[in-house]
Amino acid sequence: MNPPMTPPKLLISIYWHMHQPDYRDLISGEYVLPWTYLHAIKDYSDMAFHLEINAKARASFNFVPILLDQLEDYSAQFKSKKIRDPLLALLGKASLVGITAEQCELIIESCFKSHHEKMLSPYTQYHRLYNLYQVASQVGEDLSLQYFSAQYKSDLLVWYHLAWMGESIKRNNELVKSLIKKGSHFNDSDRLALFTLIGEIISHLIPRYKALQQKGQIEISTTPHQHPILPLLLDFKSTWDAMPGAALPLNAKYNGGEARAICHIKHAQTSHQHRFDVKPVGMWPAEGAVSKSALMLMAQQGVQWTASGEGVLTNSLHKSNPVKALVSRHEYLYKPYKITDGKDEIVCFFRDDRLSDRIGFEYAKMHSADAVRDFVQELEHIHATYQKPENPVVSVILDGENAWEYYPYNGYYFLSELYQALANHPNIEMVTQSEICQAINTPEKSLYKVFCGNLPEIAAGSWVYGSFSTWIGSKDKNLGWDLLCEAKKVYDKALKTGNLSAKEQKNCEDQLAVCEGSDWFWWLGDYNSAASVNSFDRLYRRNLSNLYVLLKQPIPAELSNPINLEVLAQLSNGDIPSSAMPSGTMKRGKKS
């Protein structure tokens, strides 16, 4: 009697998405918000570290080009010693004695923006600074600034940047350990040493990920350059696939959307190859937002694989076969799908929403060992119940930067234990998407046997609820699109006149690309804090205004008015506590 066949291993692809929008004013070059460099020293550094210390672990990373542009820009600022980020410049200022009231206000307003439970409260000296601020602020906003000495501001700046340091740095860097131990009365030398360290951390990030890729331990993919929602650039009505009858912008379409989408894709491919010495074969569409036309556009540009959310898959299966009821998730989720128009094709991986969201939203509340045990048991259950001769493929896809501030120690123990558990599990194999594609295209050269399904129809949507409700469909979001549409009409007309030089045209195109990013529309929602909405509302209108300036056209009066008047009213009715202020972390939009 033959022994029972060993079931094929479960293949897990963990895919971390890294993104920050462009926080620069492209006319002045100044950074309006500091989140890119703060996430760099905390999350991008830690995420590389966990792969570096566990050589058996495998993962994929998506880096949006505009994020990498900013990281390189920060590195250049440190080299030139000309810092264009106001908060970072204050950390590196020779002395804080005699700084302006505006600079003092920036320090006080900025340096408590974090997740207080995990990033402020654990540090007694930092928490004491917050308590002093709370007492001083009771005398009134204008007067309170007079109570803060240069020493207080120095300590606050140092502690804020220490709190934002990655856990791997806190544990292994002697300077950071000594500053945390010192706790207070930081002198100018302490502050400047920390400033220098930040420059070193940022400058080493891209080389670290490149080295991991060259070792074959990770795959790095890209995103259309400024993170636009491709399906909406192509057709607003794609919204109706998942949101029938939803309100749309007054403009019927975004003029020249296809050409703009291609520009974002090609720009991403070019910059990625320049940075990592290889052309990316994978592309994460911003927010996992796909439509049939968007997918084919990527395929035409040579993209071999992409990914989206589970909701898009279920909606697409219904659209492909409306009369067939969906059965168990095991029957349709744990395999990639091929999408084709008969000429071009692309492989699409679909996110296991339940497992991905547990990492993103649930496991932070659990002890790391319990969380890892739960995750592995879920995978073991999928493996045990997958009664097919092929390897089941589980795609865990999530934000690689914003979840960790909710975890103890920035997710240090969770990530360390997760990678160890998966890398050493006898029935689980950590793989990249390209390895799975190889198993599909050249099975004779692969260790794996992967079945690739066919998906005749795509229901346009994103990884957030399977729809575009986070970026379009509400009054404020639609107004945001209409403002962009009108700016694009002016852009097209101005370029046709021939009155702009080649350099001026390039500056205008770069500024337009910033305005086309998805983040402005995400933040125009009442599910985010009023302070967050106001901050991004102002930055979006500032970017649109800058576009008109570069086009040498008058700025429309409506760009002086907040898009979300309700948020403005909320801010006018009272101060928002620092603990509620934005820390670069987005919330999910509402289900439509």
Residue ranges and their predicted role:
Residues 23-33, 73-81, 184-190, 235-248:
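Surface-exposed, active-site-proximal loop segments in enzymatic domains
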Residues 32, 41-44, 186-209, 493-494, ...:
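Short linear interaction motifs
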Residues 62-67, 224-227, 282-290, 434-437:
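Short, solvent-exposed turn/loop segments enriched in Gly/Ser/Thr/Pro and often Arg
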